[in-house]
């Protein structure tokens, strides 16, 4: 055994201990009994590799490093540049955000090239978090990607009766869903680029909402891009308060989107049924909280909604909401950042103060330890501690959790879109607008739910636009609404977008407002809704559609083909400058 060999102990038995001796070109196994006698010598020769020139070695090393660059180095590079995400015990949004980034990262590693999601490219070096399928994995149509749908749709419930019905029909017909598989029952409503019908998937008894867009009409109005944008956005969504695109198909004349049917109608109709035609504050808080989470998710994806109003907030069969109608939405880039806040030292001699500028009522200032950053903080519990032992500095500090901010603040559009009473001042002025318009409309939305009217409505559309730009915000004397609700509305309806609540920090800032103090964000889906809609019997509805999609021409089975109203309604307006 030469000097270059090494001996390794590999185990023992009842009568001996076993060793291996490794040297250049061979491995020798042997054992030593209790008397110290070496025996059972076995030698395994290892063949020498053929000599390789330095040039070949260098070439092969560079080749291997280039190949290994793909999955591992991308992850390492991203981890160096991406913020870390921490979950909050009271907010599942951060866990969902982390899952969103994980899915995006996985999709990048899977194909080693830029992956398009609904026509949007994911940037390798930036942090763009469009989350969704490659192709049409959210519909019933097969995807060309080999990746699992579940990797992109964690909220998809395969036990959902709608998915079960679709799979049942697909297995029976052996193809994707088509127009002939649906029987249209009644018209539910109409939008700017199409009409929505209640439809039954034939042979299953399961109802869907089918949006039918007439190709010729939307092409004549130059709305094809709007229709395509809506479909791509729907394909990318995966959130409890946003719609699922179950299928999409085309006929000769129509383009159709198959979504969930919400039997509770919309919040506008539901508000009209309330006593006084406004919601109690507790009910309004429930609805706007769920809308806020949906908007937060959209902004994380770089989607500015731009059309929030009660008519577009639908009520599901369980009483929770679903945001609908994305044909006016704007897609843009977003760069999420993780902000860490310094620890806040509590001084017993300090007086009450508020961190948020919109909160001016000291009686509403309380400690919110479950928030990421205290909104309004009063160290009143320290004033009772005269007989307490003096604690150290560490115990007298609040250390806020890191805060994820994913607000697309850099987005700019010159489009003049929306409903007159909900238009933000910067849209009317033509100054260009970004994500802050959604928080203006959120303020109008909350105002209407609480008071039954919008704050700037005039005698006609021209007067309404003038009021939005030039008139101050006023509140009616009745009904009686809490200070926190009025304070939140004041913060949202600031005419200068850069001073508007949530302009920088987005929905996180709104969620920390005292108006939402009683909301448990982590368990909001378990909260009992203010009202559960009555079960709907679709076949008993009046004004039903006669048959279904007629074969051949692709018309809806109505007395005449459905047409998209070429003239916008009186409250709706859209002008694209570029």
From Swiss-Prot:
GO cellular component, one term: plasma membrane
Binding of ATP, residues: 188-196, 211
Motif (PIF): 575-578
Catalytic activity, reaction form: L-seryl-[protein] + ATP = O-phospho-L-seryl-[protein] + ADP + H(+); L-threonyl-[protein] + ATP = O-phospho-L-threonyl-[protein] + ADP + H(+)
Pfam entry (one): Pkinase
Localization annotation: Cell membrane
Comp. bias regions, Polar residues: 25-34
Region called Activation loop, residue ranges: 325-426
Summary of the tissues where the protein is detected: Expressed predominantly in root tissue with lower levels found in leaf, stem, seed and flower.
Coiled coil: none
Positions of the catalytic residues: 307 (proton acceptor)
SUPFAM superfamilies: Protein kinase-like (PK-like)
Similarity comment: Belongs to the protein kinase superfamily. AGC Ser/Thr protein kinase family.
Protein name: Serine/threonine-protein kinase D6PKL3
Gene this chain is encoded by: D6PKL3
């Amino acid at each position: 055994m030469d000097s270059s060999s090494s001996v390794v102990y590999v185990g023992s038995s009842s009568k001996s201990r076993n060793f291996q001796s490794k040297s250049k070109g061979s491995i020798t196994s042997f054992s030593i009994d209790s008397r110290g006698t070496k025996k059972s010598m076995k030698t395994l020769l290892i063949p020498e590799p053929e000599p390789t020139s330095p040039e070949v070695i260098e070439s092969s090393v560079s080749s291997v490093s280039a190949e290994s660059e793909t999955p591992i180095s991308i992850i390492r590079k991203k981890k160096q540049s991406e913020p870390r995400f921490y979950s909050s015990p009271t907010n599942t949004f951060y866990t969902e955000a982390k899952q969103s980034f994980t899915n995006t990262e996985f999709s990048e590693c899977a194909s080693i090239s830029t992956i398009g999601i609904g026509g949007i490219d994911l940037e390798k070096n930036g942090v763009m978090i469009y989350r969704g399928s490659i192709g049409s994995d959210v519909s019933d149509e097969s995807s060309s990607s080999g990746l699992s749908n579940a990797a992109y749709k964690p909220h998809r419930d395969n036990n959902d009766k709608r998915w079960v019905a679709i799979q049942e029909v697909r297995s029976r017909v052996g193809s994707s869903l088509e127009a002939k598989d649906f029987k249209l029952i009644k018209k539910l409503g109409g939008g700017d680029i199409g009409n929505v019908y209640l439809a039954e998937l034939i042979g299953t008894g399961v109802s869907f909402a089918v949006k039918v867009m007439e190709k010729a009409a939307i092409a004549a109005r130059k709305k094809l891009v709007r229709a395509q944008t809506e479909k791509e956005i729907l394909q990318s969504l995966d959130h409890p308060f946003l719609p699922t695109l179950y299928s999409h198909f085309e006929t000769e004349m129509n383009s159709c989107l198959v979504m969930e049917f919400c039997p509770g109608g919309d919040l506008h109709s539901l508000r009209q049924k309330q006593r006084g035609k406004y919601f109690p504050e507790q009910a309004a808080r429930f609805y706007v909280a769920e809308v806020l989470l949906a908007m937060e998710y959209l902004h994380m994806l770089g989607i500015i909604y731009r059309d929030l109003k009660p008519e577009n907030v639908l009520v599901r069969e369980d009483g929770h909401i679903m945001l609908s109608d994305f044909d006016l939405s704007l897609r843009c880039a977003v760069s999420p950042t993780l902000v860490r806040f310094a620890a806040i030292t509590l001084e017993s001699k300090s007086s009450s103060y508020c961190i948020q500028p919109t909160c001016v009522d000291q009686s509403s200032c309380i400690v919110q330890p479950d928030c990421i950053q205290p909104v309004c903080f009063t160290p009143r519990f320290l004033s009772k501690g005269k007989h307490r032992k003096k604690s150290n500095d560490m115990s007298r500090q609040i250390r806020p959790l890191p805060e994820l901010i994913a607000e697309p603040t850099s987005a700019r559009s010159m489009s003049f879109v929306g409903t007159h009473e909900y238009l933000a001042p910067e849209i009317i002025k033509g100054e260009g607008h970004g994500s802050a318009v959604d928080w203006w409309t959120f303020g109008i939305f909350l105002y209407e739910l609480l008071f039954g009217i919008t704050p700037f409505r005039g005698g006609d559309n021209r007067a309404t636009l003038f009021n939005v730009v030039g008139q101050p915000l006023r509140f009616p004397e009745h009904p009686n609404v809490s200070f926190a609700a009025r304070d939140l509305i004041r913060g949202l309806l600031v005419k200068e977008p850069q001073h508007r609540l949530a302009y920088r920090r987005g929905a996180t800032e709104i969620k920390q407002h005292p108006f939402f103090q009683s909301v448990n964000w982590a368990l909001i889906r378990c909260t009992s809704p203010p009202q559960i809609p009555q079960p709907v019997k679709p076949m008993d509805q009046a004004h039903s559609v006669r048959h279904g999609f007629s074969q051949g021409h692709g018309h809806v089975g109505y007395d005449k083909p459905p047409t998209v109203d070429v003239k916008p309604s009186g409250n709706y307006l859209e002008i694209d400058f570029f």
